[in-house]
C-alpha cells in the first residue's frame, strides 16, 4: 500500500485529529461517505486497524515502511510500542515538522526531498533518515530555502518544540539532544493496539 495522496480532511473526519497530516479542521462532523457511516459496535480488529491507520497517515509512511518499523522496534530493548513511536518521531521529515521548519509532515518531507535541509552541515534529501542524538538539522544556505522555512517557523504546526530538540530560531537550526519520551508525542494514539494489530501479521 503506497503513501496516501488524497483529500486529507476526509482522513481526519474518519480517524480524528492528525497534527502531522494537516492543520485544517473539517466543518463536517459525520464520517466520510454518502450518508456517513452507520453507528455500530466496532470489532477489536477494527479498533486496532484504526489505530494503525492513524500512525500511517499522521507520519505519512506506507504499509511496507510501517511493517519495517514494527520489526525494528521489536528487535530493540524496551517497549515495542514506545520504540515504534520513537522510530517514527526520529524520521528527518518529522523532526523538521517538530522544529517548525514545515507546517505539516508532508510539507516538511517536501523540504527534505527538494534539498532544502541539511544534517550536520550536509544536504540530505532522505525523508526517512533516522536522526540521532547530536545531529544538527539546518536549512541550506540560500535565499530560497531560508525564505520557505522562515514563513513556516513563525506559524508552526505545533505550538511547542519537544524537550529532546533544541531550536535556534535565528539560525534556523535544531539539535537532537536525546531520546523522544512517550509523552512528547503529539499524536493521540494507543500504540499497544498497533503492536497487537501486527502481532500475527509480522
From Swiss-Prot:
MF (Gene Ontology): rRNA binding; structural constituent of ribosome
Source taxon at top rank: Bacteria
InterPro entries, per the entry: Ribosomal_uS4, Ribosomal_uS4_bac-type, Ribosomal_uS4_CS, Ribosomal_uS4_N, S4_RNA-bd, S4_RNA-bd_sf
Composition bias type Basic residues, residue spans: 1-13
Signal peptide feature range: none
Region feature Disordered, mapped onto this chain: 1-42
SMART domains: Ribosomal_S4, S4
Pfam families in the record: Ribosomal_S4, S4
GO biological process: ribosomal small subunit biogenesis; translation
Family stated for the protein in its record: Belongs to the universal ribosomal protein uS4 family.
NCBIfam families linked: PRK05327.1, rpsD_bact
Role according to the record: One of the primary rRNA binding proteins, it binds directly to 16S rRNA where it nucleates assembly of the body of the 30S subunit.
Subunit structure: Part of the 30S ribosomal subunit. Contacts protein S5. The interaction surface between S4 and S5 is involved in control of translational fidelity.
Protein name: Small ribosomal subunit protein uS4
